[in-house]
Amino acid sequence: MVFRKSLLKLAVFALGACVAFSNANAAEGKLESIKSKGQLIVGVKNDVPHYALLDQATGEIKGFEVDVAKLLAKSILGDDKKIKLVAVNAKTRGPLLDNGSVDAVIATFTITPERKRIYNFSEPYYQDAIGLLVLKEKKYKSLADMKGANIGVAQAATTKKAIGEAAKKIGIDVKFSEFPDYPSIKAALDAKRVDAFSVDKSILLGYVDDKSEILPDSFEPQSYGIVTKKDDPAFAKYVDDFVKEHKNEIDALAKKWGL
């Protein structure tokens, strides 16, 4: 009986050691696999002016976050051309990271306590606040004027919750319509199917035209982080250190793109 117990303890210890070894390998594996394949795969938006926008003439995605992704590729692989960009939106960026289609996501991904339980976030590389884009003819001056308004937001974004809470705080009710991407929201605004387009202000800047304006209101500061899988602590640390060490370069890139 004593012998059996000893064997059981030994088996449990061995299993624990294997799990720990496996976890350690998984943690270190992402960075090594990127170096091994010689390419960093990053999920970026393709519909956000200044951040990451598809150039219809060349087929390339260009913008601030694309340049940050290239800077990360250069840091890891020594060459900013050793990168593959995968277009994502607010609804697909998490699943594509989960299933391994991308190594990291740099796509206006707001850091929240809920999301930090699911993913690893670097420290913020950019900070913004949520705003409202409206048609000038509506004569809105602030959210307080928008009782009963229908506000267009992106699917799976933090915007709906932030604006909903702000509206409740000032005692008005608003409705929401969710869309798969930002151009769809702008089209709905232009067609007067929604009364406002709400997302982070620097994103809205890319959609302002002579018929629309961004209201002065700002809601819930948004901090963007580079996102990696939760089971990659070594890679997450590398990415976090990268953001800290390249802060000045990243800030310069933001200015380059008018942010």
From Swiss-Prot:
This is Major cell-binding factor. GO terms for cellular component: cell surface; extracellular region; outer membrane-bounded periplasmic space. It comes from the Bacteria. It comes from Campylobacter jejuni subsp. jejuni serotype O:2 (strain ATCC 700819 / NCTC 11168). Residues 1-26 form the signal peptide. Pfam families: SBP_bac_3 (PF00497). Keywords: Signal, Transport. Coiled coil: none annotated.
